[in-house]
From Swiss-Prot:
CDD domains: DHDPS (cd00950)
Entry keyword annotation includes Cytoplasm: yes
EC number(s) from the headed UniProt entry: 4.3.3.7
Annotated positions for site Part of a proton relay during catalysis: T45, Y108
Subunit-structure text: Homotetramer; dimer of dimers.
Sequence similarity: Belongs to the DapA family.
Lineage: Bacteria, Pseudomonadati, Myxococcota, Myxococcia, Myxococcales
Gene name of this polypeptide: dapA
Gene Ontology, cellular component aspect: cytosol
An individual GO BP term: lysine biosynthetic process via diaminopimelate
Swiss-Prot/TrEMBL keywords: Amino-acid biosynthesis, Cytoplasm, Diaminopimelate biosynthesis, Lyase, Lysine biosynthesis, Schiff base
Species of provenance: Anaeromyxobacter dehalogenans (strain 2CP-C)
Binding residue positions for pyruvate: T46, I205
Record: active site: Y134, K162
Name of this protein: 4-hydroxy-tetrahydrodipicolinate synthase
Pathway: Amino-acid biosynthesis; L-lysine biosynthesis via DAP pathway; (S)-tetrahydrodipicolinate from L-aspartate: step 3/4
Length: 295
């Protein structure tokens, strides 16, 4: 298995007139590779994976894999709050040639820690495919605790975790209980890339990399190489742009930002609605101040 590390983008899913725009997706993927991105993560939260049909998810993952052609990692979004559906999604990612699957903790039904353990264990037993568990309690209302991550790692059921709690004590606990390099530790929070890596993280699955991929890659390289001053300066420079990517619910602002770059339309799928004019103005202003060239 390839090492799951570096600067990865939670890539948006371009849409046009209600349909997935695969041509624009290919162009976005090629641009990401040209900018130095280490991994493409389609069909995640930012990629609106939960509102894509099964056929659309297959088309998106296949398009990314065929475009990448082994030049970067592909970690395919494959989560569900039904274990049997998650298993089928991971099998799809495996059959299409992804390097790993990103599997969010089951949302809405709020399983216990034992339920979470059995969920990921069942996926592993049914697929024998590398899974990155995705812990984002703010969206799922369930928290995958370090003790459960340690159980899963010991059982070989997960290859990594995307941790989106923005809690550095949590990351310290993970390294302590699981082991520094036992699994891949990936930040799911662009605001904390530097401290996360300093606490043993291996990289990030990033939202802002959709509009500033080279800047995120440079931040990750600086942080992983121990260039604290350089990494801190890069993290600080991104702060306002990071905030504006969440001025409304993700992926609304980042899709609007991608559209402002002229790289794809900003269309969203319901129940997500376009960002307000006031929010769009804030996004545009932050992009200009960061030095991005708008279309």
């Amino acid at each position: 298995m390839r090492r799951l590390e570096g600067s990865m983008v939670a890539i948006v899913t371009p849409m046009k007139d209600g349909a997935v725009d695969l041509r624009a997706l290919r162009e976005l993927t090629e641009w990401q590779l040209a900018e130095g991105t280490d991994g493409i993560v389609p069909c995640g939260t930012t990629g609106e994976g939960v509102t894509l049909t099964p056929a659309e998810r297959a088309d998106v993952i296949r398009t990314v894999i065929e475009t990448v052609r082994g030049r970067a990692l592909v970690i395919a979004g494959a989560g569900s709050n039904a274990t049997h559906e998650a298993i089928e999604s991971v099998k799809l990612a495996k059959s299409l040639g992804a390097d790993a699957a990103l599997v969010v903790t089951p949302y809405y039904n709020k399983p216990t820690q034992e339920g979470l353990f059995r969920h990921y264990q069942a996926i592993w037993e049914a697929t024998r495919f590398p899974v990155v568990a995705y812990n984002v309690p703010s969206r799922t209302s369930v928290d995958l605790l370090p003790e459960t991550v340690a159980r899963l790692a010991k059982a070989g059921a997960i290859a990594g975790i995307k941790e989106a709690t923005a809690n550095m004590d949590r990351q310290v606990q993970l390294v302590e209980k699981v082991g520094k390099d036992a699994i891949a530790y990936l930040s799911g929070d662009d605001f904390t890339v530097l401290p996360y890596i300093a606490c043993g993280g291996h990289g990030v699955i990033s939202v802002i990399a959709n509009v500033a991929p080279r800047a995120m890659k440079e931040l990750v390289v600086a942080a992983r190489s121990g260039d604290l001053a350089g990494a801190l300066a890069k993290q600080a420079a991104m702060a306002e742009l990071n905030r504006m990517m969440f001025v409304e619910t993700n992926p609304g602002p980042v899709k609007a930002a991608v559209a402002l770059l002229g790289r794809a339309g900003g269309e969203l799928r319901l129940p997500l609605a376009p960002v307000s004019e006031a929010s769009l103005a804030k996004v545009r202003e932050a992009m200009v101040r960061f030095g991005l060239k708008l279309a």
